[in-house]
Amino acid sequence: SVMGTGRSNHCMDLMGNAEQLGVDAAVTWLGTQDWSNGRVAMIGKSYDGSTPWQAATFGNEHLATIVPISGLIGVMELMWKNGSSEARAPIMHNGVYGSYGIDGDSEDIGNMCPDYIIGPGTGVAAWMWGGEAAGTYWKERYFLDRVLANYQGSVYLIQGMHDWNVDPHMAIPVINQLKDAGIESKGLFGQWDHDYP
């Protein structure tokens, strides 16, 4: 789970800098423990499948491999393709993901952060104007460029070609971009939807 979900607390900023730094800190902690061999792997599906991409953006020496299963290479890329938005684009990101940190208990206030307020506005603005209207909200949540520039580990990319949620463009041509950048990459692609193979 990510910050603000499960039994964790703190601000869940919906794949923003705080979450990315938290994931990187977890990799460093795991890689530096006495019982660790110093090599960390990350796996996850859907939102949790995006956290391995986040970790890989830092080039952390302890991150040996990532296994994103239907994970996002970027948040805006989930709902916009070739300049066109899906119908869910203006509300999906914060309407669905934003609800993860809110469960009606006394910790809700501590789990909220400024990006909860900024997010819905950026979703609507991007839907209206086709991109980043102000600030760096979407750029901060795009991972692939930093992975290609910084990551030194390997990638095992898993994606269903019938995935209606995280579309296959998050895997193809991404696997080719990874290989072109010299990142050891393998893929498992098949005829399933937003699920495990």
Specify the residue positions occupied by each region the protein language model found.
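Conserved alpha/beta-hydrolase "acid-adjacent" motif
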Residues: 164-172
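Short beta-strand/loop motif that positions the catalytic acidic residue
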Residues: 151, 157-159, 163
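Catalytic histidine neighborhood in serine/cysteine hydrolases
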Residues: 178-196
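Cap/lid segment of the alpha/beta-hydrolase catalytic domain
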Residues: 1-31
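Accessory cap/linker subdomain of secreted extracellular hydrolases
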Residues: 54-150
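Alpha/beta-hydrolase fold nucleophile elbow
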Residues: 34-47
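Short beta-strand immediately N-terminal to the catalytic nucleophile in serine-hydrolase-like folds
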Residues: 42-44, 69, 158
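Glycine-rich nucleophile elbow surrounding the catalytic serine of serine-hydrolase chemistry
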Residues: 44-54, 165
